[in-house]
Amino acid sequence: MLVISNSEAGAPNQDPIRASLLNAGAYLIYDRLVEQDVDQAYHPHLAESWETSADGMTWTFKLRQGVRFHDGEPFNAATIVWWIGKYRGGVNDTLVDAIDHVETPDEYTARFVMKRAAPNLIYNLSSVFMGIPSPKSYDAAGDSYGVIEAIGTGPYKLESLAVGQETVLVANEDYTWGSDLSGNKGAPYIKRLTLREIPDASTAFLELKTGGVGMVIGVPDEFLPQLRAETNIGVKSLPGLGVTYLMFNSKSEPFSDITVRQATALAVDQGAILKSVFSGVGVEAHQFLISSLTESKVDPKFEIRYDIAKANELLDKAGWARGSDGVRAKDGKPLKVQLSTQSETAFRRTAEIVQAQLKALGMVAEIVTFDSTTIRDQFRKGEHQLAVSHYDWNNADILDWFYSAKNIPYPNSTMWNDPRSEELHDVAMLQSRTWDERVANFKKYQEYLLSQFVFVPLHEPVLNVAYNSTRLTLRDKFFPPFSIVDVSVVE
């Protein structure tokens, strides 16, 4: 039994085609054509090899033979034709929209004929949202697919899903086609795996310490000293793939005013949050993309950094006057906002630090705490003003996900819709012909978003994995969730 990262909490189903949120179970139920390693390199999986034409307009994949879905159906080129078609017009259509059609020269060759060059296609194909389900089972289940039944070719099968609580998986004993991301190419050693969602970090720590769970993925940094003091607990710290940030609702007053957004952003001290909430583990975030991406290397003048003097000056000039109680007001309206956060410990503590920092600006931020499912419902309804949020994603196209107008109201819960932003988005997403062009275009896109203060970057964490070292044996190279198949139980 293991506890999954809270960024995956509340996943409503295990349908990669129609979901906007999936938990780690989806990586284990489904395989993908290619897999991306922790070092960002790509490895063959259901595609044994692939070639791209010089102009980028055709991609040819040689498919692995002998693969079968959990329902016994064969995997072949016809599967790929059906699979790509299922994304059309759906929530994840952007993953395949550069593909015009799929040709099948033979039973185990699939050729993508492109509408345009799309250097990022290889990344898309490795996404958790591009796990390949069984056509037969998917079509038979209809809209209910992914809740009771989820049929892939992966090392685990879905036994049950209780949304917001746990996902139970059982080993696929017929599995013989593991990728290079795992040492074990066959059936998992752990035969029944429960992925639990425990939002409170203290509870998760106690469960690990007492043997209630065997592994916790995404351990808060402040627990590391306690964990390392336990003789029966091992810890692995891996490069993080996400950013914690503040989200503005740009359509909700007072954050519809760029001056208020800018002042709020400059009033937030990332260094204090790193020290107080994350015990100095990880790094400060000053832009939206993770620092390992080349696209994150923006001109430093666009980075969002703490400057309380300038923040106060901006509001003074904009007519937000301080009252005798220290709270600013303009046109009779006090500067009071709702600060939404999730119940998980790091989210709540971050909100409390931000609340105190905004008080120094003359802004009252009332903290309202939600569970992971309810807060997403609030985002979809546009009922939020300011929120502590987090994403895990290692590609610049996360900017499309959160800031493209087509994704309003969710996942673009910033409600950001701006002509110049859309223009830069389209150039980066649709007109980049080579990888270098794509990097340059995404830098420009992010620099514009930074200049509009549609978010406040806070912290870039590491991924801490703690496990019961007396019960579980892990490889030296451990990259969850792929490496779960390598974990063995000490008898």
Outline where the language-model segments fall.
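A structural "hinge/loop" feature
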Residues: 7-26, 46-48, 73, 121-130, ...
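N-terminal lobe/hinge region of extracytoplasmic solute-binding protein
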Residues: 5-54, 79, 85, 151
